[in-house]
């Protein structure tokens, strides 16, 4: 098993209990670069680490995310020239809005070993909370494909490596499974690898969990395992 190390700070740092945007006076970009370099150095020879992600779901960065990400990447490369680095886009890394918020998000990597990562959920507000049922969420069998498509177009335009590192659907309506089935066929055709959210026994009754219960697979597993 290998893991992705990803700081789940959303482009921010909690300073004295306050969420503070990276790139502001209190949390300068050089502080993020220092952190990134130290993480890279600490795990440089660890074979269990598949990749370093620069950040989980940065958002509302006031236009600072590209500069922040480049500084983090530069610091990683100073410590480790071989590790795969994942570069998430601004505004929650949404695939559906990638071209709107990340159209110029191309980083300079001297190692040429970077993948651009997106996330996508298929409910009405793309949050992954799935507050409404399938119909009220405006879902359809092709909604997954339609929302990923802008990201796929951008990838082709720039000929860069890519990965969908987070997506998930509720287990309580089989129509979500059909959406996922069509999405995974599309991702295979576009050569976009993927990671499903989420697994692990700590999720309990979480509707998106792929964890088995009492030895019985979650419904979504029948779809996911058919695309291994």
Describe these PLM feature segments.
Residues 194-198:
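His/Asp/Glu-enriched short active-site or ligand-binding loop at hydrolase and phosphoryl-transfer sites
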Residues 20-25, 30-51, 55-192, 206-226:
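Extracellular glycoside hydrolase catalytic/binding regions
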């Amino acid at each position: 098993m290998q893991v992705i190390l990803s700081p789940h700070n959303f482009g921010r740092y909690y300073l004295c209990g306050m969420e503070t945007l990276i790139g502001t006076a209190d949390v300068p970009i050089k502080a993020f670069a220092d952190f990134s370099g130290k993480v890279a150095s600490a795990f440089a020879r660890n074979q269990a680490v598949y990749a370093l992600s620069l950040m989980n779901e940065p958002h509302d960065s006031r236009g600072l995310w590209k500069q922040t990400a480049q500084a983090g990447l530069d610091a990683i490369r100073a410590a480790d020239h071989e590790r795969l680095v994942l570069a998430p886009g601004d505004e929650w890394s949404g695939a559906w809005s990638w071209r709107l918020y990340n159209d110029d998000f191309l980083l300079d990597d001297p190692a040429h070993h970077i993948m651009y990562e997106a996330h996508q959920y298929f409910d009405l507000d793309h949050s992954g909370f799935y507050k409404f049922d399938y119909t009220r969420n405006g879902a359809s069998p092709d909604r997954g494909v339609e929302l990923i498509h802008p990201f796929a177009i951008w990838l082709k335009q720039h000929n860069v490596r890519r990965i969908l590192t987070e997506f998930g659907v509720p287990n309580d309506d089989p129509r979500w499974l059909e959406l996922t089935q069509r999405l995974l066929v599309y991702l295979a055709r576009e050569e976009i690898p993927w990671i499903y959210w989420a697994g692990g026994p700590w999720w309990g009754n979480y509707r998106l969990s792929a964890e088995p219960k009492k030895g019985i697979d979650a419904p979504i597993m029948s779809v996911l395992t058919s695309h291994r």
